[in-house]
Regions:
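Anionic ligand-binding catalytic core segments
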Residues: 1-168, 172-310
């Protein structure tokens, strides 16, 4: 896919940018489902324009789990000359030895009756407040409280790790009989390894740190270097949450990211079969994400100076 201005700002989820195939793992081998059989995994080969992105998503999912959030299970596979990420489908249940069942899910666009084209807030899609209000409006009180907490924790992680593509279609609700739950994290990656200190001369495979930001604003701000503790307090006020408690919740996630990133990368690099280039990208990921998380932590603690342009 061509490197567009949107991609240079970290908006990677564009038509044709990422290929994927849903397949089935059965009896120790991969295969295509037959008839009504359910798939079990999603394989994603990443295009050459974004180096290391399969490993990026794999590390990001592990990072999410490491800081205490539910995240889809994944692994890195080599198929031919391609590096791909294999993600186990969380919307599947084992019925018996011969049968795998499906769990219905709706992403946040579907839950809000919006078309897929509205996944980015900047393009008319929902923001954090819209999603929180929808959850509180439609779920039982106890379930809504837990779901909102986990959704806000996911937003805190997205900020800390520079997950620019955390839009409304990348969060879902699992619906099983009378139970509703926020789906594990999926399709999450960090733009930080691709950051460059440029505004105009951004080459393919690079992301301008000055243009990059969250897919959903925190209060009025989306750029990473503009978000402060006050923005999280304002957001809390908008949705009827306690401002100080919300900041504490966000800070608790952000504080865990630097050490969790180092742990995740260390474990990855120790895996048998990891190539020098894979380890090199993982180290780049570690340095970049730790830096981003440190900046976010300084901001939430009031030690950083936001760079807001008029």
């Amino acid at each position: 896919a061509a490197w567009t201005p949107q991609m240079a700002a970290g908006m990677f989820s564009l038509s044709g940018a990422q290929a994927k195939i849903a397949i089935r793992w059965e009896e120790g081998r991969w295969g295509l489902p037959y008839g009504s059989q359910a798939t079990t995994h999603i394989l994603k080969p990443y295009w050459d324009g974004l180096p290391g992105h399969a490993i990026n998503e794999h590390l990001s999912l592990r990072l999410g789990a490491r800081v205490g959030l539910a995240a889809a299970s994944s692994e890195i596979l080599s198929i031919g000359n391609a590096t791909v990420i294999s993600v186990r489908r969380y919307d599947r249940v084992v019925v018996d030895e011969q049968s795998i069942g499906r769990v219905h899910q709706e992403d946040m666009c579907q839950a809000l009756s919006l078309p897929p084209s509205k996944k980015y807030e900047s393009e008319g899609g929902p923001g954090i407040a819209s999603i929180v209000n929808m959850l509180r409006r439609n779920l039982p009180v106890a379930v809504a409280q837990d779901t909102v907490t986990r959704f806000l924790q996911a937003q805190a992680l997205a900020w800390a790790m520079a997950a620019t593509d955390a839009h409304a279609k990348n969060y879902s609700l699992l619906l099983a009989q009378d139970a509703v739950a926020l789906a594990p994290l999926y399709d999450v990656s960090s733009a930080a390894p691709y950051f460059v200190n440029e505004v105009r001369d951004v080459r393919p495979g690079e992301v301008s740190m000055h243009k990059a930001g969250l897919a959903m604003k925190v209060s009025k701000h989306r750029k990473f270097n503009e978000i402060t503790a006050q923005d999280w307090k304002t957001l809390a006020d908008q949705v009827g949450l306690h401002p100080e408690e919300t900041v504490s919740l966000v800070a608790a996630v952000v504080q865990r990211v630097p050490s969790a990133t180092a742990e995740v990368v260390e474990l990855f690099n120790q895996e048998p079969g990891r190539t020098p280039s894979e380890r090199k990208f993982a180290d780049t990921y570690k340095t970049a994400v730790k830096r981003q998380a440190t900046l976010a932590l300084r901001s939430i603690e009031g030690k950083g100076i936001p760079t807001r342009r008029p």
